[in-house]
Each structure stands twice: as C-alpha cells, then as structure tokens.
C-alpha cells in the first residue's frame, strides 16, 4: 500500500508542476526575471512549496489556496496576479489534491495530461512608445508597456490561453446597445 501512496504523491507532484508551468502569470514572471537572477530556481521551488502546503493542510478552502499562491507570487516574484487566473489555478490544484486524497491516480494522470496539452507558451515583450508633446520641442514622454502573446501548438492568440466558453445560460453577456458612444458599458441587473 505504501507503494501506491508514493505513486499517488508523485502523480500529485507532477500535476502541481504541470499546473504551475502552464500558468501564464508565473511564466511571464520567470521569463522576465521578476524573481531576480534565481527566478528559474524559485519556480521549481514553488512546486515543492505548494505540494508541502497541501500535505500539511488537508482541509484547505479555495480562498486559502488563492491567498497562499498570491502571497508566494508577491513575495518571491514581486508579481500581483490580476488576470483572473489565480482562482483557476487554485481550483486545479485543489481538485488534484482531492484526487490524491482519494488515491485516484488515473484522474491525477488525466488532469496533468490535460493541463500539459492546454499549456500555452506566453511571451511578454516591452514596447517603447513615444509621444511628442509639441512638434517644435524635443521633449518626449516615454511609456513602457508590455505586449503579451500566447501560443498553443504554434497558433498565436492575444492575451491568455483560450478557455472553454461558459455553458451557463444565465451568464451575463454584453449587448451592443449596452455600449454607449463614450465607451462606457451599461450594466443591467438580472430580472
């Protein structure tokens, strides 16, 4: 039985690593050295730290996992995740841990495989833009922006990895008539 538990833990570890490696926010932080010169090592350490966190805390709530991951990214990579991916990654990790607790190695393998297949290669490049305030003056305001592109199997997409469309019929959609001329969107309450 100890062999099966070790196998399940190894599968959980592989799933955690797959989820973190597929996380665009972490990819960008590592690729751009937000964690300093040891960003790659910190990313590898992060997988072990997350695994240990789950092993020490068997009954974690989703918000606790989100807080832990957010705190690690803030402290280790000086990165605040605001793209909505933090709850998704936290949910994936929590689901994998539930499979681990039940000893469901097949589900762990399937989740890790699915995450790896959907993994996108994310690159962020700094763009320099300059606007002249007056054509006669040489003063230039420069702004540094980041352009993020994601590719999955060679196909480039803007922003983040494609996600499945929500199947909830009650999901709120923005209609063209709700967008007014000045760019504001009218938000209506559900009836």
Swiss-Prot record:
Region (Disordered): 149-172
UniProt xrefs under Pfam families: WGG
Highest taxon in the source lineage: Eukaryota
Record keywords, A-Z: Diamond-Blackfan anemia, Disease variant, rRNA processing
rRNA processing keyword on record: yes
One BP term from GO: maturation of SSU-rRNA from tricistronic rRNA transcript (SSU-rRNA, 5.8S rRNA, LSU-rRNA)
GO cellular component: nucleus
Clinical disorder: Diamond-Blackfan anemia 14, with mandibulofacial dysostosis: A form of Diamond-Blackfan anemia, a congenital non-regenerative hypoplastic anemia that usually presents early in infancy. Diamond-Blackfan anemia is characterized by a moderate to severe macrocytic anemia, erythroblastopenia, and an increased risk of malignancy. 30 to 40% of Diamond-Blackfan anemia patients present with short stature and congenital anomalies, the most frequent being craniofacial (Pierre-Robin syndrome and cleft palate), thumb and urogenital anomalies.
Family: Belongs to the TSR2 family.
Chain's role: May be involved in 20S pre-rRNA processing.
Record's protein name: Pre-rRNA-processing protein TSR2 homolog
Encoding gene, per UniProt annotation: TSR2
């Amino acid at each position: 039985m100890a062999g099966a538990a070790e196998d399940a833990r190894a599968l959980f570890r592989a799933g955690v690593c797959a989820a973190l490696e597929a996380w665009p926010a972490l990819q960008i932080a590592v690729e751009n050295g937000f964690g300093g010169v040891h960003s790659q090592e910190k990313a590898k350490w992060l997988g072990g730290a997350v695994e240990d966190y789950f092993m020490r805390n068997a009954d974690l709530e989703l918000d606790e996992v989100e807080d832990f991951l957010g705190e690690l990214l803030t402290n280790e990579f000086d990165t605040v995740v605001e793209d909505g991916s933090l709850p998704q990654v936290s949910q994936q990790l929590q689901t994998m841990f539930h499979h681990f607790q039940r000893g469901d190695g097949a589900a762990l393998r399937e989740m890790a495989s699915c995450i790896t297949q959907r993994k996108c290669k994310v690159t962020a490049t700094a763009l320099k833009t300059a606007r002249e305030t007056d054509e006669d003056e040489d003063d230039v305001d420069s702004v540094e922006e980041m352009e993020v592109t994601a590719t999955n199997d060679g196909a480039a997409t803007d922003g983040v990895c494609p996600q499945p469309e929500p199947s909830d019929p009650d999901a709120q959609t923005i209609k063209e008539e709700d967008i007014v001329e000045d760019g504001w969107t009218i938000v209506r309450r559900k009836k």
